[in-house]
């Protein structure tokens, strides 16, 4: 188990005078199952991109962990190929047998890897890409809205799958998914981030209690 330490993180988009984050500090363990909670447009995706090193910032983010992000960006050229042909472009060094093991946990056949990606349903594509994501070793995973545009059956499958995993930050508007899959909450406030133990419902109950006493 390792940790991710964020210290005095400050970030502002170029041309903006209002910081997205200002002097944010916290630490999390890399085997936690974190749900990232906050209103739309308040910086969740920005923070994930900071972890991925896409933007410059002041302060520090220190960890021995390697980050990987879902959903992967699939090019038009890759859409015409089988996933087995471009797995290494998404996750270099990933072994196919590990992906096949993950697909079994997602209740789908390994045969999906050998069909043109564009012929797969949205749910099948999601499951293939999640299998690739979790087939690596020692990665800390950033999972952004994995159940978007999926039917109820696929959402339930992914909920069961993620419930057995650890070492991730999950961004989702699906409260049922968050309740089932997380053991800690990252709460995005106006310009800060706080960490609480528990799932979405326990955080919501605590928030309502604090709001009530603040009146």
Question: Each predicted region: which residue ranges?
Answer:
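ABC ATP-binding cassette signature C-motif
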Residues: 1-214
């Amino acid at each position: 188990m390792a940790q991710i330490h964020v210290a005095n993180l400050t970030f502002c988009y170029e041309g903006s005078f209002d910081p997205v984050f200002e002097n944010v500090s916290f630490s999390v363990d890399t085997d936690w199952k974190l749900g990232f909670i906050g209103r739309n447009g308040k910086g969740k995706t920005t923070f994930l991109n900071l972890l991925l090193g896409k933007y410059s910032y002041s302060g520090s983010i220190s960890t021995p962990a390697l980050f990987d992000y879902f959903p992967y960006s699939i090019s038009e050229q890759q859409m015409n190929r089988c996933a087995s042909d471009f797995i290494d472009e998404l996750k270099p060094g990933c072994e196919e047998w590990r992906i096949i093991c993950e697909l079994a946990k997602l209740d789908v056949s390994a045969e999906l890897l050998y069909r043109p990606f564009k012929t797969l349903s949205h749910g099948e594509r999601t499951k293939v890409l999640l299998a690739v994501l979790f087939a690596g070793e020692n990665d800390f995973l950033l999972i952004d809205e994995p159940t978007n545009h999926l039917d109820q059956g696929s959402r339930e499958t992914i909920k069961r799958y993620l419930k057995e995993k650890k070492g991730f930050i999950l961004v989702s508007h699906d409260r049922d998914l968050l309740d089932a899959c997380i053991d800690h909450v990252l709460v995005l406030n106006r310009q800060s981030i706080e960490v609480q133990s528990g799932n979405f419902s326990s955080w919501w109950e605590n928030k309502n209690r604090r709001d009530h006493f603040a009146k």
